[in-house]
């Protein structure tokens, strides 16, 4: 299966599994905010010519399988997406109308791993992560 994309002089296929958390790992990504944030993240990715191939927002972290053109560093794209999405959240959910500075929605940092032949396994992991977390939580009730 050939999923290569192209720029003017480059053929590429660069996929990454990204994970990051809200500040203090607060469980805030649910309900309306979760739905809204999904749309915002996809739009922000498009602005950097990226495509979110798979994504899932858990209550306390975000998972994303994303295709990023080689002209952008992964850190640039993640910084852009986290920074701009925090501004969107501040304006839409916390009523901030002016410049949003001094407060943070996301924690610093993120986890990234490259995706190659294991793409289907990564997609499955992202899709089933919430169900697995619930199963583990249920098991911990009986300890």
What are these regions (language model features)?
Residues 1-143:
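Basic nucleic-acid-binding interfaces
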């Amino acid at each position: 299966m050939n999923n290569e994309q192209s720029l003017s002089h480059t053929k590429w296929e660069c996929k990454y599994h990204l994970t990051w958390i809200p500040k203090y790992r607060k469980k805030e990504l649910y309900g309306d905010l979760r739905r809204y944030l999904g749309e915002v993240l996809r739009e922000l990715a498009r602005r950097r010519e990226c495509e979110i191939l798979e994504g899932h927002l858990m209550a306390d972290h975000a998972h994303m399988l994303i295709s990023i053109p080689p002209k952008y560093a992964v850190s640039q794209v993640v910084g852009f997406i986290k920074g701009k999405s925090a501004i969107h959240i501040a304006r839409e959910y916390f009523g901030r109308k002016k410049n949003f500075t001094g407060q943070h929605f996301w924690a610093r940092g993120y986890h990234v791993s490259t995706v190659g032949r294991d793409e289907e396994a990564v997609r499955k992991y992202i899709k089933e992560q919430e169900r697995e977390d619930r199963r583990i939580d249920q098991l911990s009730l009986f300890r």
